[in-house]
Amino acid sequence: MSEKQAIFTMLGGRVRLYRGIYNPTSDAAWLAAFAADTPAKTVLDVGVGTGGAILCLLANNNIKNATGIDVSDKMLAECAKNAELNNRDIELINADIMNWRTPRTFDLVITNPPYFRGTPAAHNAHHNADIVKWMKKSVARVKPRGTFCTIVDARVASDVIAAIAGVCGDISIFPLFSTKHTAERVIIRARVGTNGPTTIYNGLAMNCDMILRDGLTISNTLATLDPQC
């Protein structure tokens, strides 16, 4: 396989990734685009996989210390190669978030959880994971007044919001619409230990080029909204 075939890009070429056991989808770009507006010195990506989300985030946010955790050593090996390809230093931890015992907390925690159903993929050790437990374990790693951000299937968004509402405030809900004009994904951002109001955005189309091609953050996209979005 040639180098051109072996590597694909995200965010208009700003992020380069090796084709491997799992190739990140647009969900990674969307998650990063909403999380990138958060000031943070430290970030944890729960279920980092091959690094798509955290690398997209680092392309738009000058975070000094990045950490990823994943139960799959094969995924982490791919992530390490992708981090090197993008000249990024990411601490990688081979552990299961469901039973990871650590006092460490982070300014920002992001996760693109294994919410999908169907035939388990070899790379997805947490196929059909308990989404509520996953979210609670992830939120537990956020510093007080820090930020949690996730992207989920719209069908489980209410479960996720209910799971984090007891410890989070300032919840922002951002729907992503398919061609059927119904939300297919929902990005959720919240702050731990606050009690601010919930904000629901109008959302954008899932194929919005300003995010996927141009690599803008969601706030920048909304400020210069393209009619096609």
Model-derived features: where do they sit?
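SAM/dcSAM-binding transferase cores
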Residues: 182-229
